[in-house]
Structures are given as structure tokens and as C-alpha cells.
């Protein structure tokens, strides 16, 4: 076997399908189409400035964020790779304000695809790791154009969640609800090869990731948690922690899947009109599915994230995930949250980070 005895993505999907005698193979075909889009995006990312794809596209998305040239290209690659096969009924993308209606010449399938075509694209010009995130749900009305409300399904109904990471090597990490598995792209064969089966997140960790520049907007429970971590071995936790921040959800997730940790992008008061920063349907939900299937925990900070009922296709949400002990601790701090601002036992009202006067 040219892959050194390791399964390819195609072989893996066939084996998974054999566990379900009634399966038609359409889900496998859709995942294969998604994986092709990820290969194409990986190639564009790898060529970077040589391909003339860096910089701004001169437009903004529905979130009000500046679109990078690669955002637009990656979105097109996802649409073109998946719209034609008759496996998907409709799609939602971070880069499109409304759900995507398939061209009339293409058959409608059984599934809904939701994706962020290029997560972390603000990093692309400085050559920091980026990725793509996707979620697949069953269409409530298969074989026809979906209604807007059909996309508003909780994460518990997902049949597949995954991401591709474009780093020193390109990897595809996915779950079908039976463990989380990572495939590495063999650039010579052009095949995804199963390199990390059944990933497991350690229950304990000494590493956390949060954007500390938002500390003045944090809720008391988050301030308490971060203060205790940064107080280290002399504080109430009695151990030293390391803090990370990459500003790429895919990169943060990958690190946690590979070696543990906890990630926080919590709800805060920076923009009272937003319940969080990350998008529920095509960022937080698929990542939560992967994390739970790897033995970790994913939460809004207060409850299991996969149980949240979406209200809008671009809904934002607070997101905490990773090693179970730390996520459970953060949820407990929110349950114990006092009605008055938290006073750090070490640093007073300001916490470890001094607030601007």
C-alpha cells in the first residue's frame, strides 16, 4: 500500500459506511467534495504572494469584516466543489448574507452544508496558520430547496463536523459521531491519509488561550478564572499555566486536540448587541462536535454548546472548549457568579490586567 499501511480518507469513509447498512453513500460523497475544496484552498494558501492572492478584496462580508482576496476565492471553491453532485440541498457560508441556492441545473440532495471557507484570514498576509471549518446536517426537506428555518438546527443534529488546517502540513480533521480523526494530505499522492486516529484530549491541562486585550470587558467568572491561572503556583490553583493566543480558531482547536488545553472566546460587554464573537452554525458547532468526540467539553460558558437552538444563520455566541476539568470549572464559576463585580483576591477589582482609566 503506497500509504504505508494507513487508510486513506476514501477507505475510512467506506469502512464507516459499512457500519450503517442503510447508508446510501451520499454523505461520503459530500465529504469527499468538501475535502477536494480544502485541497484546492491549501494550494492557493501555499503559493501565497506568488499567486497574487494576498491582501484585501476591497469588500466586506455580512459580519462587517473586511474580506481578504483568499476569503472570496475560498468561498467560491467550496461552492463549486459541492454544488454539482446532487448531495447537498443548500449551503450557508460566513461570506454570504443569505443561504446559497444551488443553480437550477443541479439536483438537490439530502444534506445542508455550513462553512467558514477561510478561518483566521486576518493572519494570511503574515503567513500564520489558517483553515476551513464545516458542518453537515440532514435537510428536513430533502431533494428540494431548503427554507431559511431549515438551517436553524442545534449542533446535536450534525452528521459530520470538521476542519482543514493549512500549516506546515495540511490536515483534515473530522468526526462522523464516532471519534475524532485526523488525516494528513500526502502532496505526492494527493491523498488524505489517516495519521491520527481517535484523538483524545487530556482531561487536565496547564494551558489556556484567550485574547487578553479584551480583559476589561470580561464577565466576573472569566476574570476570576484567568486571574487564578496567571497567579500560578503561588495562587489558588497552586500550579503554573501558560497562555496562548493565535487569533485562528482552527489553529487553537488543533493545538488543543493534539496536546490539550482550554480555549475561551467568551461573551463580554465590548459590544452589548453581540452575544459573543464566533459564529454558532459554522464555527462553534462543528468545533464542539470534534471536541466532544475527542473526550473534551464545549460550552457557552454556562451550558453545553451543541444544545443551543440557533435563531439566525450568522448568530454569534460565547465559546469555551477543551479539557473537561477546565471547562467544567469555568461553568461552575459562572453558576457562582456574584451580582456585583468580581474582586480578585490578589489584584482587587481590576484583576491581573490593569483597566484603562
Curated annotation (Swiss-Prot):
**Residues annotated to bind Mg(2+) 1:** 94, 116, 118
Say yes or no: keyword Hydrolase present. Answer: yes
Whether Hydrolase counts among this entry's keywords is yes
Q: What is its main location?
A: cytoplasm
**UniProt-annotated binding residues for substrate:** 119-122, 211
Q: What does the entry give for GO biological process?
A: fructose 1,6-bisphosphate metabolic process; fructose 6-phosphate metabolic process; fructose metabolic process; gluconeogenesis; reductive pentose-phosphate cycle; sucrose biosynthetic process
User: Could you tell me the EC number(s) of this protein?
Assistant: 3.1.3.11
The enzyme's first-digit EC class, named in words, is hydrolase
> How many and how are cofactors bound here?
Binds 2 magnesium ions per subunit.
The record's listing under Pfam families reads: FBPase (PF00316), FBPase_C (PF18913)
The entry's family comment says:
Belongs to the FBPase class 1 family.
Name of the molecule in the record: Fructose-1,6-bisphosphatase class 1 3
Amino acid at each position: 500500500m503506497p500509504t504505508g499501511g494507513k487508510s486513506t480518507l476514501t477507505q475510512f469513509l467506506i469502512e464507516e459506511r459499512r457500519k450503517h447498512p442503510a447508508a446510501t453513500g451520499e454523505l461520503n460523497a459530500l465529504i469527499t467534495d468538501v475535502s477536494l475544496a480544502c485541497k484546492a484552498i491549501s494550494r492557493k494558501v501555499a503559493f501565497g504572494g506568488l499567486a497574487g492572492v494576498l491582501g484585501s478584496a476591497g469588500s466586506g462580508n455580512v459580519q462587517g469584516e473586511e474580506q481578504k482576496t483568499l476569503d472570496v476565492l475560498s468561498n467560491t471553491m467550496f461552492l463549486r466543489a459541492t454544488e454539482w453532485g446532487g448531495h447537498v440541498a443548500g449551503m450557508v457560508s460566513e461570506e454570504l448574507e443569505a443561504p446559497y441556492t444551488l443553480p437550477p441545473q443541479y439536483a438537490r440532495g439530502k444534506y445542508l452544508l455550513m462553512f467558514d471557507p477561510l478561518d483566521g484570514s486576518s493572519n494570511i498576509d503574515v503567513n500564520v496558520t489558517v483553515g476551513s471549518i464545516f458542518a453537515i446536517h440532514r435537510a428536513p426537506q430533502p431533494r428540494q430547496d431548503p427554507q431559511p428555518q431549515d438551517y436553524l438546527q442545534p449542533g446535536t443534529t450534525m452528521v459530520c463536523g470538521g476542519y482543514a488546517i493549512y500549516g506546515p502540513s495540511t490536515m483534515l480533521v473530522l468526526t462522523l459521531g464516532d471519534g475524532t480523526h485526523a488525516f494528513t494530505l500526502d502532496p505526492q499522492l494527493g491523498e488524505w491519509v489517516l495519521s491520527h486516529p481517535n484523538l483524545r484530549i487530556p482531561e487536565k491541562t496547564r494551558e489556556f488561550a484567550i485574547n487578553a486585550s479584551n480583559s476589561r470587558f470580561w464577565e466576573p467568572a472569566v476574570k476570576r478564572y484567568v486571574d487564578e491561572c496567571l497567579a500560578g503556583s503561588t495562587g489558588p490553583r497552586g500550579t503554573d499555566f501558560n497562555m496562548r493566543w493565535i487569533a485562528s480558531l482552527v489553529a487553537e482547536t488543533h493545538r488543543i486536540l493534539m496536546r490539550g488545553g482550554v480555549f475561551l472566546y467568551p461573551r463580554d460587554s465590548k459590544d452589548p448587541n453581540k452575544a459573543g464573537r464566533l459564529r454558532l452554525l459554522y464555527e462553534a458547532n462543528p468545533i464542539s462536535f470534534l471536541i466532544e468526540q475527542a473526550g473534551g467539553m464545549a460550552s457557552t460558558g454556562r451550558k453545553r454548546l451543541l444544545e443551543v437552538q440557533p435563531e439566525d444563520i450568522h448568530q454569534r455566541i460565547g465559546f469555551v472548549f477543551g479539557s473537561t476539568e477546565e471547562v467544567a470549572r469555568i461553568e461552575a464559576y459562572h453558576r457562582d457568579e456574584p451580582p456585583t463585580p468580581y474582586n480578585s483576591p490578589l489584584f482587587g477589582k481590576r484583576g491581573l490586567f490593569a483597566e484603562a482609566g
